Amino acid sequence: MSKEKFERTKPHVNVGTIGHVDHGKTTLTAAICTVLAKVYGGKARDFASIDNAPEERERGITINTSHVEYDTPNRHYAHVDCPGHADYVKNMITGAAQMDGGILVVAATDGPMPQTREHILLGRQVGIPYIIVFMNKCDMVDDEELLELVEMEVRELLSEYDFPGDDLPVIQGSALGALNGEAQWEAKIVELAEALDTYIPEPERAVDMAFLMPIEDVFSIQGRGTVVTGRIERGILKVGDEVAIVGIKETVKTTCTGVEMFRKLLDEGRAGENVGALLRGTKREEVERGQVLAKPGSITPHTKFESEVYVLSKDEGGRHTPFFKGYRPQFYFRTTDVTGSIELPEGVEMVMPGDNVKMVVDLIAPIAMDEGLRFAIREGGRTVGAGVVAKIIA
């Protein structure tokens, strides 16, 4: 039997279900797979195979996530679902599964609950750009006014966290009803799929973004100059391009006079490739690991930012004791550690292993960063936390 060929023809979009425990996220995931397979063709997945999520390790953090895939006529979706609330928090903070859009599941029987709010806040902090609401269990509510009330509450809650609550799609359905093959609820799943297609714009591909390459190594080649190596994170580097060296020290500009891969000279390097870039007139000691090579003006160095952080539990190899204000660990960005101090939110005296917390970080040296950049928190080379830059302060 020949292997199925992966069709690269359709745009690929990453989504996931978020929301309060027991509001039906996994049931909805199963319903989407089942109904779309029935309507558009494809492979159905049953509830058990989704809920029984395998353990993954991202930066030493144990996260249970299940990944399913489905198709609409226009797109291919990769969808992530997590069994437990802690898994969601870790998943969103580490970026183990980056989302182009989230499906917020709210049970019509309960309305918004504490984790509904927390997931919306996290979505805002970690930069989930679009949210679509699926109001679940609507078959268990026979009062039309109550459904309207819940919808209004959810929209207001989203607006509170700067999502366009009044304008985003809200679909009232029943995941279980759809799984059981009831036509009126199956139609709601198709409506959800159409909302995904129209409301979430096609994500920009890494290769089309502004060039950026974290510098992993620097060496000089007799008679040719300085070469920096690394994996291109985004964009394209062409021979002759002007580039900026950003982070740690003052930003300097130079020109890339050569690109090589596996000792072969190329005209350009593209996102995802490991390359060496030859820099004109740059001395070996002017560049170091931890800086980035980038399109001039596309990224700036910063030292102070607000972040959302998950602190590893003892079982995950994290700290055994809490930390307090005045804690000074290393913050590992892309390829290097930088020492920094922290400020905890008002009223938070200490942070326990296994907690997630909002904190302001002040680094001793600037790092090239954008909002949404992930980092690890380390003590002597051991990872004790993971975080994401939520808002740049200075």
UniProtKB/Swiss-Prot annotation:
Region (G1): 19-26
Primary location group: cytoplasm
GO molecular-function term, one example from the UniProt record: guanosine tetraphosphate binding
Species of provenance: Vibrio cholerae serotype O1 (strain ATCC 39315 / El Tor Inaba N16961)
Record Gene3D superfamilies: P-loop containing nucleotide triphosphate hydrolases, Translation factors
Start and end residues of each stretch annotated as G3: 81-84
G5: annotated span: 174-176
Boundaries of every tr-type G domain copy: 10-204
The enzyme's E.C. designation: 3.6.5.3
Location(s) in or outside the cell: Cytoplasm
Function comment: GTP hydrolase that promotes the GTP-dependent binding of aminoacyl-tRNA to the A-site of ribosomes during protein biosynthesis.
Gene Ontology CC terms, in alphabetical order: cytoplasm
SUPFAM superfamilies per the UniProt record, alphabetical: EF-Tu/eEF-1alpha/eIF2-gamma C-terminal domain (SSF50465), P-loop containing nucleoside triphosphate hydrolases (SSF52540), Translation proteins (SSF50447)
Disulfide bonds: none
Region (G4), start-end ranges: 136-139
Protein's name in the database: Elongation factor Tu-B
Binding, Mg(2+): T26
Subunit-level organization: Monomer.
Catalytic activity from the UniProt record: GTP + H2O = GDP + phosphate + H(+)
Annotated keywords: Cytoplasm, Elongation factor, GTP-binding, Hydrolase, Magnesium, Metal-binding, Nucleotide-binding, Protein biosynthesis
